[in-house]
Amino acid sequence: MADHLEEMPLFPLNTVLFPYAQVLLHVFEDRYREMIRHCMQYDQGFGIVLIRSGSEVGDTADPYLVGTAVRIVSVQTFDDGKMDVKVQGERRFRIRRMDDESKPYLVGQVEPVIEMEVEDTPRTDALVLKTREYVQDYIESYFSRFDMKIAKVKLPQDATALSFVVANFLQIENIQKQHLLETTDTLERITEMIPILEQHMQEAAMPQYTRLDRLQVEEFISPN
């Protein structure tokens, strides 16, 4: 098993990132700036993992064991050395071993998390269709409050990719997102998300609703 492990720099954060999703990281600690420079020099990505205990700043945090490997999309370095780093989630991994001594930042020996194959059945089609309709209605309802008409919500055709994209912008606790990330059954993930989407749709009808983050969904929408 050890022969199949991949060495990966790890970035523990108070957030859960899914495959296919993008996030902008504000990097200011020396150890993580060094990590980003290392990744750029050797054209490699790193892993984002949710913090189980500890904090983002200071001593090394204790992370959950399942995270998402990301590739660096762009880096902006400021005069004071701080960085804005845009990354794209690509695949999940599970940490088998961790090393917090050889580098200033945490390094993991990781293996892939394998998703179960999705069976092409009427139930699958129905769940995927319901998810698409709910997401379309949810986003359109939210943006209509700002007099913005959405021509189209562009979501992945693949059921697994769809489940990850939707899970990323759900407004739920990190521990719930971590559970969805660790789930290896696409239909189970979608089934668990549908009642959450239903609740989001009800909340979105309220005037004070502001929970949807436009930055998380803007790459999937086409304004009129």
Regions found by a protein language model. Give the residues of each.
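N-terminal low-complexity, acidic/polar interaction/targeting segments
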Residues: M1-N224
